[in-house]
């Protein structure tokens, strides 16, 4: 492994960013100059060079002597300000090169065996090349080596007759020999023959024979290339006899022999060759090149290391000489026998073989003098080991300033060539190319800087042979490689539209661990096939192989993708332009393939010229070994010691079994069956992974099916391309047509449209024409996407590095996003179009150690030796620690301020228990499983209650039975689509799907149907609601929504900027008149700057990390500041400014204006325990052991406020005991709705019964009065209210009120009739965006409402006459994001009558305080909110209750301001001027209508539902008008009821919106999160601790990827970008075989966008 060393001169910015500090400071003696520099001397692995002496000569010619500290640091101050020169010696650490181990004892210990084997393999390779012999691995065993010869009809060429006869003579001798000999011969057939055979591809039989005989004497298997170097040395000596007089040539021959000696032989060879070649030239460049070559062996003090190697030279030289003597004797014996018998050697080789033996004799004769020569060169070289650096000093104090502007960079004179431009062809990269010569070289781990120049040693082994012919050929072959399967654009079920081939991807096995193991398989109906572990048609990721031919290696991966490489020399690597994600390197003689994700693949088992995958490793050293025996995979060894037994028949896997360390079976992972042709017929791999297959004689997949309802059939043309699909339930009824001359394919979809694809000769899609004519164009360079042009002409360009990673993205608006990587493809920095940068420094394993955002905040990470995350430290000082079991599973989580969590697993790595160490005792949750299922059959909760789960054969959840015995049922159809759900009350809902198995509607329990229709491109075109009203949608050719037409004819028309972001919404009434335009403006980074609507202009400003620092609405600004941890700490611009203090992620203090701060204390579990201000107000919270709120009380005053909560075993609220309002008890039905409420207050008792229909609509409310004995009985119930509903679930009549709705389902009339009174009617008017804009009251008053671009109400104005000059004529509202932060009431003359500010608990809608300003006076009241976040009390700063309120269940709100005129008791409310308009979370009371404004809608407490339909449609649940099903537990702060999208809170795990089975058989999941932080945190947990890419939780996002290739990466933060669901702001995920989106709720900014978003999930 390369461990390059470098000296870095740190700029001030580098020093600050990397947190470097040292007490090792030396004065240069020039205080007048006062300049400084910070030296950081380290290896490329990141390890420091400790205690290294140095001399620095500054611009004053002053010599400054010093030594680095233990961290490789030293600061020089008061030095000359110009250029300086720095010379550094070696450090105090040790140089420890890897030692090779002897592992070839059978042949080495028996010269006769070695000689026999050498001649045997030479003949075998020569004859195999002529097609005359073939090794039969199937019939070979420890007792027999089986080789098949030419058939009786094959003529043996005359020149090969003696060779052929001699081979069979040797074959008999081997098979008559010992068992150990036959084992060794079989081993060589599979382990050594491939590269030696490839080297012998030039028909040089003499060289091949020489090498094969020598091979038998080599102690270290795997050194085949070193063997060849001995033979090649002899061949060169034969061709140029004069070279035998050159001491350098003789010395190189001696070193070739030393290199194969176990132990330090290889290190001596590498060092010796580098030294003598460098000293021969003698230039500083060559000397430094040699230093860097030797440095590739190890970190450490090179002088001490070379001294130790020099001392070993004589010992290893003697062993090598003895080895040469044995080889020489064997060669002489073979030659002597051949002369006597006039055999094949004489006929094929003539004099060349004899001459090579003569060259070897001369080497042996001069061997001792060669050792002396090498030793003298070691002595000469050791004195020249030094590192030189030149650079410029920094001004005084620079290092202490993190924001110092960049100065002139330090220039590193490393005596090597300056870095060259990275190569993009197949050439081998060497050290003097300026790039690491080892694909796993430990690269720069720190944030790159123009001011930091490294001295880096490569790992090249000196002069290299000319690879030009191979490079040319490899380039030609790689240029013919087709586009990879990851570029597949599929249609149907599924078909690759570039080729027309049916393709299929499946994952059969997934095992977690230190390095997770998966077995994935791939099928395609046409193209070249390569039989593998699953037979003739399917290929697995374990089938990855290298095919060698004349110095070229062709990689074929598990999906038949190919890449062509030149075989690299030792210490170098080569690239394949068409697959830049791979690099092929040679390390210690072995070929190693490295992927950009950091995984390394080794190939040590040979099948002829094919090398099979033998190991997978990560950067942390975790390794999966694949053990082969004579072409059959037998075992897979996992990093934790467990094994997978691979049972095969005819080299095909028939069973995979997980075994423990002692090879005892634990679990059958999968089993396979085949037909006589080797075609895979069935797979049994556990729930959801069981399939049966049928094929045509040509191997075309005709049908596959699972064990449930899903099947797919294909028809083909003569070329194996799909013509038509047929599937269960008629999904994907597509047809395919091809125009080969035009490289064009057509897909006729089930929607009636035709999608056309045009490809290039390499199967890259150049054009995709949608059914509506829109054309997407793509440009490719070496199979890498270089640009794409959308149908509107917007061009996006991609720049890439040598790894194929995108380094710059230029969007259609010209903005550029930049990504910086180190030499191994690890992200170092991201820079947004405004120049803000996020930096990442990494450890030797490539894992992020520090992530820093543009605001200077840093997150620090520590890891175990296995590369698992062990600790995270945030910029606020919070630390979270992780501990793992031996299998790499999380065993203990210590989340800083919260209790530790311990996890337990069974032998199948399934979670079985979780212990949380609460202060009330350990809380235990358990999971039980049935058989081998990975999904739990039962969960036992902390209180002992249980929930049971049932599944079908495909692993779909079919039933849930809760602790009360209530059962929920689920039924599925083809492709695991959910068809029916039945709740415990028997209500059944049915779901419908379109032609491509996407959700297309629902039939509710009452038979009403909500339907979606789609256009020819598969886009939602029509939405038909329960009542028959229809919304229609139109799109442009780029797939962007351009128009929504409502049932009444009103329209919303959408416009987009060049970047695809929503830029304008035009609202038009049914008569065509415009209601005005809403416009959106963005900055270069895509962040919203301005949203202007007819009623409001909203403007935003951001800090460098992208956090909002200013929100201005109609000129009124709310300013936000953040602390070091990124938490909101200051809010200004409101009535009273807010100051927030945080500790460990918890709110600890809150200051409101100049009032005494509130302080907060928390339980060990993180729940709020107490809040107080030190002046009398103190609110205490009590929590159950399972985290349920059990009580609230005001401390210090008995009885003034105490509230307690009771729950059932399902944690549902069943009772409230309130010191003021009395006691409440609730009874719930199977749907979780309250069916009975009993209240007791003193001696007063009453009860109510609630009746619902199957759609959970409240139909009837009955009251129960106590009988004479005070008892409450249901038989005494009397109906109070009954409601009538229409087919859409809207209330049409309730009591004496009638309700009418318009064509869009919005309330337009509320008419109340009372006997003896004139009917009272309230009229409601709406705009095209479904916003209530005007109310006309029965008394003639009219109120008009205004909104901003996001649907937030910003004003309420009374139109016409007002009753008095003191009456409120206008109300203005203030917003802080989605929180209604206040309102100001104005009189007719514009004077303020009352201003209110509401303060909420951070990140929620739970009110915390109310600030009022009236008549110049400001007063503060603290709000006490109940379980659901409803304001219940207003308390003064001294703790007195001044107001009480209670929201009735399905009824009106009641309040108490001042119960008696004179305050007598502290518990009595006082001061009738104090009141609170807040209701349920997110709601504010409108006195004029009695409605509650609820952000996106208006809630009518009398109806218990909203007065307009949910703007997000069915995404809000099956009751578009309904409020939550149980307001005693659930809230809807956004007015998007029931909708998992908008129920508050979403929770840290988000809410799953949709789960489907993709056409490839993988699961696709879309989830909604509150914001990107929550989404990232959730994703980080899913990916596990072994992530190699990550971003901090407060800045821009790039992505994470773990060791298995699972990933989470940023989609976009903009609106209207992408196609389909990808148009909405999201992250992308690919985790555990599940792909999908993580949508961000806070980026969906207005009602129109909610409509669009909702429609995407219908």
Swiss-Prot record:
One of its GO terms (molecular function) is toxin activity. It comes from the Bacteria. Pfam families: DUF6531, RHS, RHS_repeat. YD repeats lie at residues 821-857, 939-966, 1014-1050, 1326-1355. The keyword S-adenosyl-L-methionine does not apply. Residues 400-413 have a biased composition (Low complexity). This is Putative deoxyribonuclease RhsC. It comes from Dickeya dadantii (strain 3937) (Erwinia chrysanthemi (strain 3937)). Keywords: Hydrolase, Nuclease, Repeat, Toxin, Virulence. Its EC number is 3.1.-.-. The keyword Lipid metabolism does not apply. Residues 473-490 have a biased composition (Basic and acidic residues). The lineage of its organism: Bacteria, Pseudomonadati, Pseudomonadota, Gammaproteobacteria, Enterobacterales.
């Amino acid at each position: 492994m390369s461990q390059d060393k470098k000296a870095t001169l740190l700029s001030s910015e580098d020093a600050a960013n990397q947190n470097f500090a040292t007490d090792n400071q030396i004065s240069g003696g020039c205080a007048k100059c006062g300049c400084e520099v910070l030296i950081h001397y380290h290896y490329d692995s990141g390890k420091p060079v400790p205690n290294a002496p140095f001399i620095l000569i500054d611009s004053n010619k002053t010599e400054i002597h010093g030594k680095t500290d233990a961290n490789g640091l030293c600061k020089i101050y008061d030095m000359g300000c110009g250029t300086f020169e720095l010379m550094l010696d070696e450090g105090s650490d040790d140089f420890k090169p890897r030692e090779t181990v002897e592992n070839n004892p059978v042949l080495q210990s028996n010269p006769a065996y070695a000689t026999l084997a050498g001649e045997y393999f030479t003949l075998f390779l020569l004859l195999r090349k002529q097609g005359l012999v073939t090794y039969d691995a199937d019939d070979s065993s420890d007792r027999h080596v089986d080789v098949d010869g030419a058939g009786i009809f094959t003529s043996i060429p005359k020149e090969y007759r003696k060779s052929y006869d001699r081979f069979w003579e040797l074959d008999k001798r081997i098979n008559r020999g010992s068992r150990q000999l036959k084992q060794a011969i079989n081993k060589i057939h599979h382990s050594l023959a491939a590269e030696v055979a490839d080297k012998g591809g030039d028909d040089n039989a003499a060289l091949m024979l020489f090498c094969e005989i020598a091979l038998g004497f080599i102690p270290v298997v795997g050194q085949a290339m070193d063997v060849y170097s001995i033979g090649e040395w002899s061949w060169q000596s034969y061709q140029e006899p004069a070279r035998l007089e050159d001491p350098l040539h003789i010395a190189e021959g001696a070193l070739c022999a030393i290199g194969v000696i176990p132990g330090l032989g290889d290190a001596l060879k590498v060092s010796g060759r580098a030294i003598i070649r460098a000293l021969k030239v003698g230039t500083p460049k060559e000397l430094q090149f040699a230093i860097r070559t030797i440095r590739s062996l190890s970190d450490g003090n090179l002088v001490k290391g070379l001294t130790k190697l020099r001392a070993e030279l004589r010992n290893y030289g003697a062993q090598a000489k003895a080895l040469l003597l044995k080889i020489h004797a064997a060669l002489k014996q073979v030659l002597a026998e051949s002369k006597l018998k006039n055999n094949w050697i004489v006929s094929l080789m003539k004099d060349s073989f004899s001459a090579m033996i003569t060259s070897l004799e001369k080497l042996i004769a001069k061997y001792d003098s060669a050792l002396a020569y090498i030793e003298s060169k070691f002595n000469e070289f050791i004195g020249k080991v030094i590192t030189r650096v030149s650079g410029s000093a920094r001004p005084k104090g620079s290092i202490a300033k993190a924001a110092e502007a960049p100065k002139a960079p330090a220039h590193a004179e490393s005596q090597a060539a300056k870095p060259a431009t990275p190569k993009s062809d197949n050439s081998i990269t060497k050290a003097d190319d300026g790039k690491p010569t080892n694909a796993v070289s430990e690269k720069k781990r720190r944030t790159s800087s123009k001011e930091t120049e490294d001295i880096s040693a490569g790992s090249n082994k000196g002069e290299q042979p000319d690879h030009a012919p191979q490079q040319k050929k490899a380039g030609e072959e790689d240029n013919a490689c087709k586009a990879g399967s990851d570029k597949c654009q599929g249609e149907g079920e599924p078909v690759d539209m570039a080729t027309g081939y049916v393709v299929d991807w499946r994952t059969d096995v997934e095992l977690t661990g230190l390095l997770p193991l998966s077995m994935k398989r791939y099928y395609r109906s046409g193209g070249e096939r390569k039989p593998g572990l699953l037979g003739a048609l399917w290929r697995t990721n374990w089938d990855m192989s290298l095919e060698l031919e004349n110095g070229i290696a062709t990689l074929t991966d598990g999906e038949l993708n190919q890449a062509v490489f030149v075989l690299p020399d030792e210490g170098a690597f080569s690239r394949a332009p068409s697959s830049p994600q791979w690099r092929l390197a040679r390390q210690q003689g072995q070929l190693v393939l490295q992927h950009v994700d950091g995984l390394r693949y080794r190939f040590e088992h040979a099948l002829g010229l094919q090398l099979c995958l033998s190991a997978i490793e990560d950067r942390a050293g975790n390794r999966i070994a694949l053990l082969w025996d004579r072409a059959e995979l037998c075992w897979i060894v996992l990093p934790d010691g467990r094994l997978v037994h691979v049972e095969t028949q005819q080299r095909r896997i028939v069973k995979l079994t997980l075994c423990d360390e002692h090879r005892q079976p634990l679990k059958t992972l999968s089993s396979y069956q085949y037909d006589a042709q080797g075609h895979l017929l069935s797979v049994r791999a556990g729930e959801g992974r069981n399939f049966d297959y049928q094929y045509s004689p040509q191997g075309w997949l005709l049908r596959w099916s699972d064990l449930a309802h899903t099947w797919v059939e294909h028809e083909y043309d003569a070329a194996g391309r799909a013509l038509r699909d047929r599937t269960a339930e008629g999904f994907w009824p597509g047809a395919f047509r091809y125009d080969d001359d035009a490289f064009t394919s057509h897909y006729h979809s089930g929607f009636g449209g035709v999608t056309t694809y045009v490809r290039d000769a390499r199967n890259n899609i150049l054009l995709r024409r949608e059914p509506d004519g829109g054309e997407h164009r793509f440009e490719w360079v070496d199979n890498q996407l270089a640009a794409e042009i959308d149908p509107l002409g917007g061009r996006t360009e991609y720049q890439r590095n040598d790894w194929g990673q995108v380094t710059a993205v230029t969007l259609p608006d010209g903005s550029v996003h930049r990504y910086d990587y180190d030499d191994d493809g690890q992200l170092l920095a991201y820079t947004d179009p405004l120049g803000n940068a996020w930096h990442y420094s990494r450890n030797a394993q490539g894992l992020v150690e520090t992530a820093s955002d543009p605001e200077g905040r840093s997150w620090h990470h520590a890891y175990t030796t296995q590369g698992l995350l062990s600790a995270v430290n945030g910029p606020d000082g919070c630390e979270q620690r992780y501990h793992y079991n031996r299998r790499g599973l999380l065993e203990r989580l210590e989340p800083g301020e919260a209790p530790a969590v311990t996890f337990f697993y069974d032998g199948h790595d399934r979670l079985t228990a979780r212990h949380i160490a609460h202060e009330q005792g350990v809380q235990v949750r358990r999971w039980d499983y049935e058989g081998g299922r990975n999904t739990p059959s039962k969960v036992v909760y902390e209180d002992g209650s249980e929930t049971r789960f049932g599944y079908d054969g495909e692993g779909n959840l079919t039933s849930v039975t809760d602790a009360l015995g209530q059962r929920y049922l689920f039924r599925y159809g083809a492709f695991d689509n959910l068809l029916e759900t039945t709740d415990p009350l028997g209500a059944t809902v049915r779901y419908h799907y379109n032609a491509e198995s996407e959700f297309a509607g629902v039939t509710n329990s009452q038979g009403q149907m909500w339907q979606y229709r789609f256009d020819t491109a598969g886009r939602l075109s029509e939405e038909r609601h329960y009542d028959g009203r229809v919304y229609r949608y139109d799109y442009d050719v780029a797939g962007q929504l351009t128009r929504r037409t409502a049932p009444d004819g009103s329209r919303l028309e959408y416009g987009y900027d060049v970047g695809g972001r929503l830029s304008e919404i035009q609202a038009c009434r049914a008569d065509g008149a415009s209601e005005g335009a809403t416009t959106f403006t963005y900055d270069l980074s895509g962040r919203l700057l301005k949203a202007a609507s007819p009623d409001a202009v909203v403007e935003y400003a951001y800090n460098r990390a992208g956090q909002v620092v200013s929100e201005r609405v109609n000129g009124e600004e709310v300013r936000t500041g953040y602390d070091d941890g990124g938490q909101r700490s200051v809010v200004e611009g409101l009535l009273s400014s807010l100051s927030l203090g945080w500790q460990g992620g918890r709110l600890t203090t809150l200051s409101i204006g100049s009032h005494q701060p509130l302080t907060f204390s928390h339980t060990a579990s993180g729940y709020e325990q107490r809040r107080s201000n030190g002046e009398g107000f103190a609110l205490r919270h009590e929590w159950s052991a399972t985290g349920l709120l059990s009580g609230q009380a005001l401390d210090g005053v008995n009885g003034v406020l105490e509230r307690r909560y009771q729950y059932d075993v399902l944690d549902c609220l069943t009772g409230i005991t309130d010191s003021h309002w009395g006691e409440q008890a609730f009874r719930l039905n199977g749907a979780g709705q309250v069916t009975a409420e009993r209240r007791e207050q003193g001696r007063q008792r009453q009860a109510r019964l609630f009746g619902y229909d199957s759609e959970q609509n409240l139909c009837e409310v009955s009251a129960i009065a106590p009988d004479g004995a005070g008892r409450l009985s249901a038989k005494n119930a009397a109906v109070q209210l009954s409601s009538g509903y229409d087919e859409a679930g809207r209330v049409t009549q309730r009591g004496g009120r009638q309700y009418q709705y318009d064509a869009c389902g919005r309330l337009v009339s509320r008419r109340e009739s009372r006997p003896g009174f004139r009917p009272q009617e309230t009229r409601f008017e709406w705009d095209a965006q479904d916003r209530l804009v005007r109310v006309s009251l029965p008394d003639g008053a009219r109120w008009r409402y205004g909104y901003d671009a996001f649907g937030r109400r910003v004003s309420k104005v009374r139109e016409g006459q007002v009753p008095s000059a003191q009456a409120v004529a206008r109300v203005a509202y203030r917003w802080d994001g989605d929180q209604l932060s206040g309102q100001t009431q104005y009189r007719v003359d514009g004077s303020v009558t009352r201003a209110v500010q509401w303060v909420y608990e951070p990140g929620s809608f739970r009110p915390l305080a109310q600030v009022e300003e009236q008549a110049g006076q400001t007063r503060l009241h603290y709000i006490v909110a109940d379980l659901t976040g409803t304001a219940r009390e207003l308390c003064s700063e001294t703790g007195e209750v001044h107001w009480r309120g209670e929201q009735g269940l399905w009824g009106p709100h009641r309040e108490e301001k001042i119960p008696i005129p004179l305050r007598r008791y502290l518990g009595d409310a006082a001061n009738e001027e104090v009141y609170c308009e807040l209701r349920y979370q997110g709601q504010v009371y409108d006195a004029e209508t009695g409605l509650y404004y609820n952000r996106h809608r208006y809630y009518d407490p009398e109806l218990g539902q909203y007065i307009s339909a949910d703007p997000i449609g069915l995404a809000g649940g099956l009751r578009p008008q309904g409020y939550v099903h149980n307001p005693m537990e659930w809230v809807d702060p956004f007015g998007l009821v029931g909708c998992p999208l908008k129920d508050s809170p979403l929770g840290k795990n988000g809410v799953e919106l949709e789960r489907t089975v993709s056409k490839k058989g993988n699961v696709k999941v879309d989830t909604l999160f509150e914001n990107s932080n929550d989404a990232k945190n959730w994703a980080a947990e899913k990916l596990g601790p072994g992530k190699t890419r990550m971003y901090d939780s407060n800045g821009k996002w790039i992505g994470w990827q773990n060791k298995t290739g699972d990933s989470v990466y940023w989609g976009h933060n903009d609106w209207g970008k992408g196609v389909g669901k990808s148009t909405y702001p999201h992250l992308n995920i690919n985790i555990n075989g599940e792909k999908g989106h993580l949508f961000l709720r806070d980026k969906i900014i207005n009602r129109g966008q909610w409509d669009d978003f909702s429609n995407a999930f219908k």
